[in-house]
């Protein structure tokens, strides 16, 4: 069976540094940080008092007020980003066969704020069970793609992948394979997350995962820097329209890139820590290259998982050196989490959009906030430090890893 070619025809982004894909890109290349003091709740008693929140986001500008009240923020974000991507793809909803259009989404946690608030309300009462009737449908992780499909009438495959921070990359790989195998013509894919809540901040603080650089939030996310002390929690959504190449060509769609392949692996090592030698990361990148039919020397750019954690950054770069050998020093490596923070289940989608736009514009966004060299990192690697670099990117890789040892990797290629 001959596999169909799959391309990207639409992008949508709602991030801490920009509420559209164009705003997001402009902020990326200018090296803008999205971190600042938490405004959603009083964080004075928390170890970490800052995060990468969305700015100036008003859901009722995009979604009916009645529906907003029935959606957790992670679903609101999904609706807005997917609408932008569908419009960007110029998909004619009156013409497309909706039975062959799916929605495959990623969310690592889902409706955390809804769960938190309902439980707190119950705990504050006398034990009488008084719950919002929308508690469950607001909270469950699969509800975001459900709402997207209901709005647009898409009747193809519809579900959420949950693999912590690898969730939206897993969703993209599933979407890629459904189209490759001929089961769908178009899939709305991506991911969303809204974990900047008391429970989210408190939980990650309890496991010592977050930076506590409260005196300087904007510089706290510093991947690959020797003084990094944890990630900065972010939120938002990224949406990508994947489409059969012939279907896209027939309707005259703009094509951003071809999706050449995806790879998956497991660390099988520790619940939250990476293998120190990056064994699972080595496997996932090799799997992705094999799936795409590429050689290591074909890759020009890697948007790393790069969370700004002491263990994770070193393990990933060790793995890159192992997989790419001498060619590793020729690759523009970066971590856009230095600007957006860590969007958890939405990270894979948002960072894939950054890699795709790097190909389109011929510019690789920087890894900001780097000032102290880490002696455990190969000095020959080009980590695109502090300033964007011009680069003719033909092939870009996006790495995403999640708690539980989940590893996902996607490869994109500029269309010839």
Question: At which residue positions do the language-model features occur?
Answer:
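Conserved beta-ketoacyl condensing-enzyme motif
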Residues: 8, 23-24, 29-163, 192-203, ...
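Flexible, low-complexity linker/loop segments at domain and module junctions
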Residues: 1-8, 93, 97-98, 292-298, ...
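ACP-dependent fatty acid/polyketide chain-elongation machinery
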Residues: 1-67, 89, 246-258, 353-367, ...
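Condensing-enzyme catalytic core mediating Claisen C-C bond formation in acyl metabolism
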Residues: 5-9, 36, 215-292, 301
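Active-site-proximal alpha-helical scaffold in enzymes
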Residues: 78-91, 144-145, 149-152, 158-193, ...
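Glycine-/small-residue-rich "gating" segment that lines the acyl/pantetheine channel
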Residues: 125-132, 173, 177, 193-250, ...
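A glycine- and small-aliphatic-rich helix-loop capping segment at beta-alpha/alpha-beta transitions
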Residues: 21-27, 113-128, 178-181, 201-214, ...
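Acyl-CoA/ACP chain-elongation machinery
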Residues: 183-229, 262-276, 306-313, 330-381
């Amino acid at each position: 069976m001959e596999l169909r070619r799959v391309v990207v025809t639409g992008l949508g982004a709602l991030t801490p540094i920009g509420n559209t894909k164009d705003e997001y890109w402009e902020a990326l290349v200018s090296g803008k940080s999205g971190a600042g003091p938490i405004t959603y709740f009083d964080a004075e008693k928390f170890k970490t008092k800052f995060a990468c929140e969305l700015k100036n986001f008003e859901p009722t500008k995009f979604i009916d007020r009645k529906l907003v009240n029935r959606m957790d923020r992670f679903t609101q974000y999904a609706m807005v980003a997917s609408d932008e991507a569908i419009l960007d793809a110029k998909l004619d909803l009156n013409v497309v066969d909706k039975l062959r259009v799916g929605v495959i989404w990623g969310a690592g946690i889902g409706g955390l704020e809804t769960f938190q608030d309902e439980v707190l309300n119950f705990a504050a009462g006398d034990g009488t069970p008084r719950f919002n009737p929308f508690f469950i449908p607001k909270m469950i992780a699969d509800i975001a793609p459900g709402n997207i499909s209901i709005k647009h009438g898409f009747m193809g495959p519809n579900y959420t992948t949950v693999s912590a921070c690898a969730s939206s990359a897993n969703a993209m790989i599933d979407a890629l394979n459904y189209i490759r195998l001929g089961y769908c013509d178009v899939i709305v894919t991506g991911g969303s997350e809204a974990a900047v809540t008391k429970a989210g901040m408190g939980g990650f603080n309890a496991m010592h995962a977050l930076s506590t650089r409260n005196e300087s939030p904007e510089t706290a996310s510093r991947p690959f820097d020797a003084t990094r002390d944890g990630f900065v929690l972010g939120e938002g959504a990224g949406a990508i329209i994947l489409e059969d190449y012939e279907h896209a060509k027939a309707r005259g769609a703009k094509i951003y890139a071809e999706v050449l392949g995806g790879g998956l692996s497991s660390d099988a090592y520790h619940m939250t820590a990476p293998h120190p030698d990056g064994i699972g990361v080595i496997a996932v990148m090799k799997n992705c290259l094999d799936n795409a039919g590429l050689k290591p020397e074909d890759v020009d750019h890697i948007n790393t998982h790069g969370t700004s954690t002491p263990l994770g950054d070193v393990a990933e770069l060790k793995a890159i050196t192992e997989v790419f050998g001498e060619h590793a020093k020729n690759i523009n490596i970066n971590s856009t989490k230095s600007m957006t923070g860590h969007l958890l289940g939405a990270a894979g989608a948002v960072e894939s959009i950054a890699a795709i736009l790097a190909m389109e514009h011929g510019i690789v966004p920087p890894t900001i906030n780097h000032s102290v060299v880490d002696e455990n990192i190969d000095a020959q690697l080009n980590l695109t430090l502090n300033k964007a670099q011009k680069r003719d990117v033909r092939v870009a890789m996006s790495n995403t890893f999640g708690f539980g040892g989940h590893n996902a990797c996607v490869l994109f290629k500029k269309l010839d």
